[in-house]
Amino acid sequence: MRKYLLASISLLTVVTLLAACAPAGEGEADCSDPDVFCVGLVTDVGKIDDKSFNQSTWEGVKQAEKELGAVVQYIETTDSKDYGKNIAQFADAGFDVIVTVGFALGEATLEAGPQYPDVKFIGVDQEQYPGAEVENVVGLIFPEDQSGFLAGALAALMSESGKIGSVCGTDAVPPVWRFGEGYRAGAQYVRPDVEVNIVYHNDVGFDKTFTDPEWGKTTAISMIDKGVDVVFGAGGKTGNGALLGCAEKGVMAIGVDTDQYYTVPEAQSALLTSAMKLLTPGTFDLIKMAMEGNFPQGGNYVGAAGLAPYHDLADRVPAEVDAKVQEIDQAFKDGTLQTGVSPAKPE
């Protein structure tokens, strides 16, 4: 189990409560009942149906409802000041597990841990550092740099112009930094002369950086107009906008977090692959551990990452290109290759 530092930051994200309670006619479940297993989720920036990060994590919670019989609810935060209040809403109601989605909720999650020692907290994308762990808080983290590296290698090998791009949310969020810089490193690893244009949406607040599809689209189109022929969109709805810009202009796109061939069908014609974090199984696995009494004692749980299938563009990917991507992926698994990307943007 790898352990890292939890960087903390305040950020804007959610407050609409939607509940999936007991079956119709039985009334709302009592989560204080020891025989009822309840899981609550507090989202990061964006909505629960963002076709990306929040949605994929929620699907892991829903899997626990289906397979484990858990009672599940979520809260969409609308103001960063409400992080603690939203977490407390679930904890005070007797929820067994609380999933907080995104780097920005890390500080509030760590603060809630000691206040509610009987609750198991899963902090998605919230890295925990040695010496700063809380026993009932586990960070679900992923090797985004490796996934981004694979995406960059593929993009560089597929590019005819020798120019590739990436449209990202803010690089102040370490996983976004690792995706973007991993993409750059992977491209240069397989094609040192490739031109890589990465734009981070650092010019707005955290309430906007991941929820700005228009900016994402116009930024991608601007790149394309300058010769970029593969674009990696990494930043929630902002990144989704970049995918749509690629579809409009007829150039290849790479999605993020989930297999966006399914979550952004409007961009299917352009989607080469997606740099995935397997959020759904990672979330479900930790919930199941909590239910079975095998929840980790603080620290981090490292989920899997990799590329999605090529889907409609599979015929365009030469066998030698796919072989090189697979070779790199295997080298990561064997531990014989490192990305060289720092865990977070250097100060």
Model-derived regions: residue spans:
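Bacterial N-terminal signal peptides that target proteins for export
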Residues: 1-9
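Hydrophobic helical h-region of N-terminal Sec-dependent signal peptides
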Residues: 10-14
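A residue-level marker of the well-folded mature domains of exported/periplasmic proteins
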Residues: 22-347
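C-terminal motif of bacterial Sec signal peptides marking the signal peptidase cleavage site
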Residues: 16-20
